[in-house]
Amino acid sequence: MKLVHMASGLAVAIALAACADKSADIQTPAPAANTSISATQQPAIQQPNVSGTVWIRQKVALPPDAVLTVTLSDASLADAPSKVLAQKAVRTEGKQSPFSFVLSFNPADVQPNARILLSAAITVNDKLVFITDTVQPVINQGGTKADLTLVPVQQTAVPVQASGGATTTVPSTSPTQVNPSSAVPAPTQY
């Protein structure tokens, strides 16, 4: 009986020795000198987002102070202004189309039957020059990736205000709510 115990102990010892030999080949990275993970740190939680690319239909050179605004809005109510769920505005800094974007949103703001739209616009010197002219449903009806194509805004004569400047406004019911270029700090990465 003692012989059986000794033989099985020897077999286990040989098996463990063989396993230990194999694991010696696996290299583990050494921790950096100044990094430490505390028990209170948690990994970053990634919020849901909508991403895509903004294209301009015509070949045009945008000036460095052009501002691209991408907006995610809830246009569920026909007789009310759309509710902006997420918006990002950045100076193009001389970069040209296409522009990639990622808009994070709060999923609690999106109702299952909501009409969620994605739109974009470009302003130059506080004047609207390019907009999306088609409805781009996302999230509930269209997924979370969408490409947008911008078209030129038709220029029309506008009455001059007493202050001497013309105004270009976006109706409050439009899903594209833009920020004036003077309100967007520069430089910013998109």
UniProtKB/Swiss-Prot annotation:
Lipidation feature positions (S-diacylglycerol cysteine):
19
Lipid addition sites, N-palmitoyl cysteine: 19
The signal peptide, as residue positions, is 1-18
Q: What Pfam families does this protein map onto?
A: YscW (PF09619)
Indicate whether Membrane appears among the record's keywords. Answer: yes
In this chain, the stretch annotated as Disordered covers 162-190
- Give the membrane topology, semicolon-separated if more than one: Lipid-anchor
Q: Name one GO cellular component term.
A: plasma membrane
Low complexity bias spans: 162-182
Keywords recorded for this protein, A-Z: Cell membrane, Lipoprotein, Membrane, Palmitate, Signal
Q: Does the keyword Iron-sulfur apply?
A: no
Subcellular localization is given as: Cell membrane
Q: What is this protein's name? A: Uncharacterized lipoprotein YbaY
Q: Which organism is it from?
A: Escherichia coli (strain K12)
